[in-house]
Every structure is written in C-alpha cells, then in structure tokens.
Amino acid sequence: MPWIQLRINTNSDDAETISDLLMEEGAVSITFEDGKDTPIFEPKLGETPLWQDTVVVALFEADTDLAPTIEMLKTLPFLGEHFSHKIEQIEDKDWVREWMDNYHPIQFGKRLWICPSWREVPDPSAVNVILDPGLAFGTGTHPTTALCLEWLDSLDLSNEEVIDFGCGSGILAVAALKLGAKKVTGIDIDYQAIEASKANAERNDVADQLALYLPEDQPADLKADVLVANILAGPLRELAPLIAERVKSGGKLALSGLLKEQAQEISDFYSQWFDMDEAAHKEDWSRLTGKRK
C-alpha cells in the first residue's frame, strides 16, 4: 500500500507541538530530521535535543485527504498561512529488505572485518566479527568506532587482557577477542548494552572469554594490558583516574568519542598517567592513544 508523506520545515521549539497535532489528524508515524545538517555531538545528561532547523515528517495512509490538515496548520501562529511544506506519495516497499541492503561488510585495518549476519563473509581467512545493526550502539560505521577498531587491529593482542570501557554493542570487546585477546572485560552503565554485548559475544563464539559489568559491579582490583574507551569527552575526563588505575604499568590506552577540538585538552589531562601519542582523526572525530607510565 502506498503512503502520503507530509514534510514540514519548522524549528526545535515547535516540532513536538506539530507532531502531536499531526498524530491527532491521523498520522501513522512521525519522524524528525535535521533541516540543515547540524550535528548534535554531546547533549547534556537526560536531554534528547532537536536541531534548530527541524523537519517534521508525517506518514499518512494513501486515502487520507490532507487538505483539512493543511488548513488547520495555516492557523497556527508559529507557522502562518505560507508555511514551508511538501506533500508526496511514497511507494510501498519491503522496508526491512531496503534497510538490510544498506549494510555491507566493512574492513578495519589489515585483518579485521565487521560483517552483518545476512551477508557472505568476504574473506573466510580474515578475522571476522558477525554483528547486526541494532539498538543504539556501535556497528563500525561511526568514525569513533572505526578508529578504535583500526587501533585494535594494529596491536598484537595475543594473551592480553583487555577492558572495553563503555562497551555498548560489544563490538570492540568481541573484536579484541577475535584478534587474540585472552580475556576482555566490558563495562557499561546501560543494562541493555550489557545484554547486547552478551548476545554478540555468543554469536561470535567468544562469550566464555567476556566478563560484563555495570560500573558499580566491576571488581575493585580490575586491571588490564589494554583499555579502550569509546565514550564522550565529559565522561572521559570525569573517569580519568579510574581508567588510569585500570591499566597496568606499560599498558596501552585508546580513547575516542572525542571531537577534534576536544582532543588536546583530554590528551593533556591524561598525560598525568600516560605517555600520550599524537591524535588520530577521522572526519570531525579523534582518537587518543598512550602508554601507562
């Protein structure tokens, strides 16, 4: 069945109100899109901010008459009679198949591949991690995840113990194990992330080598040869003493989730405990690495 799509250009202040009104008018779904390619990098705790220029996209059944809805919207003082909008017919598709077709195996470094389960592994002799996109966690497509995967691929992890601080989907933890790590400990504040990491470890036959903890449950004496933390600048700074304590003398560190302009400050801060390397960059994001003093 085809659908009718209504797109309305507005701002972050009015988007929720318009969304509620369109649902009352019979919309079957509402999504918000960025109107001017303005990224939101690090929202405050508990916030789910919208872009200043927001596009409200409403989907209606094909036989819906939108004329009364448009007339109603014209009466809203914050939109006005000549508000910017677009109506178009959307063909029916197998949206699941369309979504799946967008994901392909990706190589990181020389050895490592991240492969969706429905795709054929390009190189059976490579280090292959089977991971499906899902939840709100890393799949390798984000620059910070890619930077961390490339770094792990560059290391000899044979018989090393690794900590994945902020493990999310478990992509870094599972990759480290597939690359030869003896044991990995994953830590995350979100129980859903713990479950996702567990499921992905089981899928890749490394669950028996992965220990997972919420922060309050992590062992007090936990230490590792390698620690990777792909979180954000604020938590990286706040958790720096704990992260440093978790790395053995001479151990290796990688930090990501940082914007380019945040990298130098975080590097300087961590230099209390680590000999820090030059930052690596991908798009607007950075990765810091260092060796424990």
UniProtKB/Swiss-Prot annotation:
Keywords: Cytoplasm, Methyltransferase, S-adenosyl-L-methionine, Transferase. GO terms for biological process: methylation. The keyword Aminoacyl-tRNA synthetase does not apply. One of its GO terms (molecular function) is protein-lysine N-methyltransferase activity. It is an enzyme of class 2 (transferase). S-adenosyl-L-methionine binds at residues 145, 166, 188, 230. SUPFAM superfamilies: S-adenosyl-L-methionine-dependent methyltransferases. GO terms for cellular component: cytosol. It catalyses: L-lysyl-[protein] + 3 S-adenosyl-L-methionine = N(6),N(6),N(6)-trimethyl-L-lysyl-[protein] + 3 S-adenosyl-L-homocysteine + 3 H(+). InterPro entries: Ribosomal_L11_MeTrfase_PrmA, Ribosomal_PrmA_MeTrfase, SAM-dependent_MTases_sf. Its EC number is 2.1.1.-. It comes from the Bacteria. It holds the Pfam family PrmA. It is found in: Cytoplasm. NCBIfam families: prmA. Methylates ribosomal protein L11. Belongs to the methyltransferase superfamily. PrmA family. This is Ribosomal protein L11 methyltransferase. It comes from Shewanella sp. (strain ANA-3). The gene is prmA.
